[in-house]
């Protein structure tokens, strides 16, 4: 049995069946995770107050160097406004960025008595595919994320607020959203984290989750 499995589960671990929710957003130079460059990555660990309400931790974010031979679609750069080769980006190689990104996530998984992190994203399959493709390319070890399961805030927002677009869902949830700041991995990750916490907390307030149900997660 692993050390994390021996550690008593925190209320957060019990809330999500041993999974630690971590919001991830990426900015890329295209849609193909195998061929197109990863340019930015940001992660926001989700924590829980004593009363069971969720809140986002500060983001951990990196600009990323395009990997050797990466495809870069000009249309994608025009959409995000990112110049991949601007030296002021202080970009890191993929493997270095992911190793640093994963370190605090593994620490939080351990401290909460969780088994794994689970990626939370807005259209999460996209972010998950780029994160895992980059980890595979860089031979990054000890990836803390579940290899295929995710929590998708586009789906959750459609249920809770009747809208799937991040900016509109945030507005409906009462979360300020600046379209001029959008398409930055860090900004979008923070707003996705706020949206996720808003939906889960609202569900709790409506009686959809109580502390009595925590035993079901064991």
From Swiss-Prot:
Cofactor(s) it depends on: Mg(2+)
Molecular function, one GO term: 3'-5' exonuclease activity
Cofactor binding notes: Binds two Mg(2+) per subunit. The active form of the enzyme binds two Mg(2+) ions in its active site. The first Mg(2+) forms only one salt bridge with the protein.
Keyword Magnesium among UniProt keywords: yes
Residues annotated to bind Mg(2+) 2: 25, 27, 183, 188
UniProt keyword list: Exonuclease, Hydrolase, Magnesium, Metal-binding, Nuclease, tRNA processing
Annotated residues for binding of Mg(2+) 1: 25
Residues under site feature: Important for substrate binding and specificity: 31, 79, 126, 148
Active site: 183
GO biological process: DNA replication proofreading; tRNA processing
E.C. designation(s): 3.1.13.-
Listed GO CC annotations: cytosol
Pfam families given in the database record: RNase_T
Residue span, Exonuclease domain: 22-196
Family, per entry: Belongs to the RNase T family.
Protein's name according to its UniProt entry: Ribonuclease T
Organism placement in taxonomy: Bacteria, Pseudomonadati, Pseudomonadota, Gammaproteobacteria, Oceanospirillales
Gene: rnt
């Amino acid at each position: 049995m692993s050390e994390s499995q021996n550690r008593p589960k925190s209320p957060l671990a019990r809330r999500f069946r041993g999974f630690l929710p971590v919001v991830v957003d990426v900015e890329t130079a295209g849609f193909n995770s195998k061929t197109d460059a990863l340019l930015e990555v940001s992660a926001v660990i989700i924590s829980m107050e004593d009363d069971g309400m969720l809140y986002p931790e500060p983001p951990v974010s990196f600009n990323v160097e395009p990997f050797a031979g990466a495809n870069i679609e000009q249309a994608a750069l025009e959409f995000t406004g990112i110049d991949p080769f601007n030296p002021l980006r202080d970009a890191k190689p993929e493997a270095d960025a992911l190793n640093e990104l994963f370190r605090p996530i593994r620490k939080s998984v351990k401290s909460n008595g969780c088994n794994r992190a689970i990626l939370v994203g807005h259209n999460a399959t996209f972010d998950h595919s780029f994160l895992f493709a980059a980890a595979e390319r860089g031979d990054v070890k000890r990836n803390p994320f579940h290899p295929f399961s995710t929590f998708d805030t586009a789906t959750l927002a459609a249920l809770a607020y009747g809208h799937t677009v991040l900016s509109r869902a945030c507005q409906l949830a009462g979360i300020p959203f600046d379209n001029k700041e959008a398409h930055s991995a860090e900004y979008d990750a923070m707003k996705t984290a706020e949206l996720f916490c808003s939906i889960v907390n609202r569900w709790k307030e409506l009686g959809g989750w109580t502390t009595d149900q925590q035993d079901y997660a064991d």
